[in-house]
Each structure stands twice: as structure tokens, then as C-alpha cells.
């Protein structure tokens, strides 16, 4: 398996943040982004990869290692903001908030995908960036672990939707629960399965 590395970062100079988001597709819960900066790019953390390729246990171990050696920021866009704007604009908002939370003077921002937020720093969009850039892959892990923890908290309030397992995604089990129990304030009303249930 090929792992991300610092090739993209090393082509640039200065302080470089990697940014990624988690939670664009679910029917419930916020979208969360993380921004990660490795000040010392000689730092080696074995196993960093796109969070979707890692087990929950592996993500948790890597998360702890990343936050112990890297600078990071977290940004969230709430369900209310997703409902008010749309998921794309809410995602960009969460990315911008992650960079603000990072609170560093940056030279470049590497963003996974092709729809970056408008920020004051130079931005490079990297399609499949979480497979190429260590900084972006690390951001994907930090964002994923953060959101999974939040969905666990929401699960404790609404266990009937089993968000601990499905993380708010539109699984058959989740859709059946919506049919039985209706929707909560944590559901995205402008997503088709939810809007049809209203």
C-alpha cells in the first residue's frame, strides 16, 4: 500500500496546513473539518493514511500521535447552518473555522478536493489529497475521530438511531428509525430522505 508523504509540502516553502472534512454525506450531525501543520516535516508517524482506509482503533492511535506532535485546528458547521445554506457552503465554512482555530501564520493551505474555502492564505486544491499529502491525511484522521466522538455523544441522547454505529449516514437501519421515530434537531432537513419525511 502506498502511503501519503510530504512530497507536496516539500515543493512549497514555509508553514503549510493540510485541510480535510468529514461528514458531508450523513443525514444527521454536523460537518467537521480539521487543519494540521507539521512544523517539522522530518516527523515520521507510521501508518498515516486517508481516514477511510483505517480501522477505528488505528485512527484513534494515530489521532493521539498526530495531536502530540503537530499543530491542529478544528472547525464545525452545525446542522442549522447546513439547513440554512447548503452542504457545500457549510463545508467551506467548517474548513475556514478550522484554519482560524489553528491560529498560525500560514504560507500555504493544501485542501482535499476541488472546492476550497475562500481564505486569506494561498490555497492549493488537491484531488485525492488525503491519499497524497501527509498533512491532509492527518487532517482527515483528526476530523474523523472528532466527529465520531461527537456522534457518540448524540447517540447517547438518541440511541434509537444508532448513530454510534452509522455516524448519521443513511443506512437502512437509520432510515427505518426515522420512519418509526421521526426526525430530531440533529437531522439535516434539506437532505432528500429527511425532506421527504417532513
UniProtKB/Swiss-Prot annotation:
Please name the GO terms that the record assigns under molecular function: manganese ion binding; RNA binding; RNA-DNA hybrid ribonuclease activity
Give the source lineage, highest ranks first. Answer: Bacteria, Pseudomonadati, Pseudomonadota, Alphaproteobacteria, Rickettsiales
Q: Which HAMAP family match?
A: RNase_HII_B
UniProt-recorded name of the protein: Ribonuclease HII
**How many cofactors are bound and how?**
Manganese or magnesium. Binds 1 divalent metal ion per monomer in the absence of substrate. May bind a second metal ion after substrate binding.
Gene3D superfamilies (UniProt xref): Ribonuclease H-like superfamily/Ribonuclease H
Q: What are its E.C. numbers?
A: 3.1.26.4
UniProt function note: Endonuclease that specifically degrades the RNA of RNA-DNA hybrids.
Q: What is its main location?
A: cytoplasm
Disulfide linkages recorded for this protein, renumbered to the chain, are none
Gene that specifies this protein: rnhB
Q: Which Pfam families match?
A: RNase_HII
> Which organism does this record belong to?
Wolbachia sp. subsp. Drosophila simulans (strain wRi)
Task: Tell me the Gene Ontology biological-process terms attached to this UniProt entry.
Answer: DNA replication, removal of RNA primer; mismatch repair
Keywords from the UniProt entry = Cytoplasm, Endonuclease, Hydrolase, Manganese, Metal-binding, Nuclease
